[in-house]
């Protein structure tokens, strides 16, 4: 029996690999002769970098970059030496969690630190990039990131247009001659799970701006400024990605990646499953095990475990899911490729007790053992 395990992290409790290894132990207790493969799982959002570092023998690279409010912040990315790949989350450098609620300012917030991370990885030898762009604090169209990478944005007086959302309206000329030449050799894949265009009522400013501090009175003007920036970009580069699905992700960072860096935008789970080589392992799997901290209706809507399940079903494998907790609505997962799911709790306890890593590991192992005794 070949068993492939790819379970998302149980946040605050077990990492993806820790959960996978706990399941592995339980499977071996029940099926000592089983062939078991454990792969990291993430959806391109928070935790993706750490999951791939741990699961693919990567190296964590720590660095200090310019934060969203122009002060130094500690960021990190993953370095996968074998494939010269950098795995990073823009939120590490320009995330909304780095800005206190009372300090959010879309006119000032910059993505400059994201460009600094990319530069650092390029200098280290990385030529392949997997970049998650969820959880941004910015609405700058990617101007900050691009400036760090060498692009010049000039106003009508040929003076630097500045940074943040306030720079969008000032840009009248773009000079890409200083763009980091190493980018010509780079292949950038962006994990993007939103389909919003750059501008308009379903664009970046109207939909995601409010959580970044955009007021009702600012929406229209900032959206018009973003459209102006897109028009100047189109004139300078001869491209038009304004209405491309995902262009509005991360305050227009999706647009910047498409227009200036030749990146591809891919659903996060699809990108990660390809990166960890899960498809190859599933080709001859008998049973696939997945799961996450909480299995609910959102899981069925396409989160990482369902992504694994759908891929597994193409190879006719049985799919089992384990979770820290399971809601009634999780039954919808049975229609999305998960044959059976199981909560791992074995007794009544507090949330803190359930999330204790040693307890969660023991519960995961014990549940996996009992389930695999049936197989």
Could you tell me what each predicted segment is?
Residues 2-133, 137-375:
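N-terminal loops that bind phosphate or other acidic moieties
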């Amino acid at each position: 029996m070949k068993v492939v395990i790819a379970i998302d992290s149980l946040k605050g409790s077990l990492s993806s690999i820790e959960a996978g290894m706990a399941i592995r132990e339980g499977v071996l207790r029940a099926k000592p002769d089983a062939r078991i493969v454990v792969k990291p799982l993430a959806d391109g959002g928070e935790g993706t970098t750490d999951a791939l570092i741990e699961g693919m023998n990567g190296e964590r690279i720590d660095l200090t970059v310019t934060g969203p409010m122009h002060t130094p912040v500690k960021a990190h990315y993953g370095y996968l030496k074998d494939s010269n790949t950098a795995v990073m989350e823009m939120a590490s450098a320009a995330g909304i969690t780095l800005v206190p609620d009372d300090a959010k300012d879309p006119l000032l917030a910059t993505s400059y630190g994201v460009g600094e991370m990319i530069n650092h990885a390029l200098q280290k030898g990385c030529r392949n990039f997997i970049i998650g762009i969820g959880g941004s604090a910015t609405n700058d169209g990617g101007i900050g990131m691009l400036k760090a990478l060498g692009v010049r944005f000039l106003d009508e007086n040929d003076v630097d247009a500045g940074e943040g959302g306030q720079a969008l309206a000032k840009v009248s000329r773009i000079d890409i001659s200083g763009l980091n030449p190493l980018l010509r050799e780079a292949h950038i894949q962006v994990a993007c799970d939103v389909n919003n265009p750059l501008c308009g009522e379903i664009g970046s400013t109207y939909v995601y701006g409010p959580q970044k501090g955009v007021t009702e009175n600012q929406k229209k003007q900032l959206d018009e400024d973003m459209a102006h920036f897109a028009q100047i970009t189109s004139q300078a580069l001869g491209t038009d990605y304004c209405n491309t699905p995902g262009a509005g992700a991360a305050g227009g960072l999706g647009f910047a990646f498409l227009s200036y860096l030749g990146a591809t935008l891919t659903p996060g789970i699809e990108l990660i499953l390809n990166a960890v080589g899960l498809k190859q392992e599933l080709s001859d799997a008998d049973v696939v095990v997945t799961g996450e901290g909480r299995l609910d209706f959102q899981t069925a809507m396409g989160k990482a475990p369902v992504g694994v399940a759908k891929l597994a079903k193409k190879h006719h494998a049985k799919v089992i899911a384990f979770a820290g907790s399971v809601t009634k609505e999780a039954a919808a997962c049975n229609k999305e490729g998960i044959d059976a799911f199981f909560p791992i709790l074995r007794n009544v306890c507090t949330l803190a007790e359930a999330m204790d890593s040693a307890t969660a590991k023991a519960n995961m192992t014990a549940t996996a053992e009992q389930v695999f005794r049936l197989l």
